[in-house]
A protein has these predicted regions:
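TRNA-recognition modules of translation machinery and tRNA-sensing kinases, especially anticodon-binding
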Residues: 1-159
Length: 159
């Protein structure tokens, strides 16, 4: 078996290790195209937090956008059945404007999305995977959880 660690750059190894981690926890790989219809992002501007999105008109006249976000593509393509949890991992490029120089950048993102009828187990698993993801990248990390419901639950359990 080939030792790919010798030929992969450190960021490529990290992506490979992260996707392997997510796969071991049962997350299905999600892959989408580089663009979506602009309307998806226009309806969800507050979620995206972007004031500018790269757009173009395709050959059939539809206004399209280079993806500024992966989550919305996953949500759009997920089943919405009651009682079902959709767990996806992804490694994809998004296109966002830089805060520093206001130019657009292609950014590689790797992560997970857990969508649907989510319970306590799913929330704990996502937090666990956040910790394991950070450990994969570096031993020097801080995990900041700012959801008040989770923080209250942790405080209640620790008290």
């Amino acid at each position: 078996m080939k030792d790919y660690n010798k030929i992969l750059k450190s960021d490529e190894r990290a992506v490979f290790d992260l996707l392997d981690l997510y796969s071991r926890y049962g997350y299905s790989r999600f892959k989408s195209g580089k663009f979506e219809e602009y309307e998806l992002y226009a309806r969800n501007r507050d979620f995206i937090g972007q004031d500018a999105i790269l757009t173009f008109t395709d050959s059939s006249g539809r206004l399209m956008a280079l993806k500024p976000d992966v989550t919305l593509s996953i949500a759009k393509n997920s089943s919405d059945e009651p009682g079902v949890v959709n767990s996806f991992s992804y490694n994809d490029y998004v296109y966002r404007r830089s805060r520093e120089d206001r130019t657009f950048r292609e950014i590689n993102q790797t992560g997970i999305e857990c969508i649907g009828d989510i319970g306590s187990y799913d929330i704990c698993e996502v937090i666990l995977l956040a910790v394991k993801s950070l450990e994969t990248i570096s031993s020097d990390y801080v995990l900041d959880i700012s959801h008040m419901g989770i923080v209250r639950g942790l405080i209640r359990e620790l008290a």
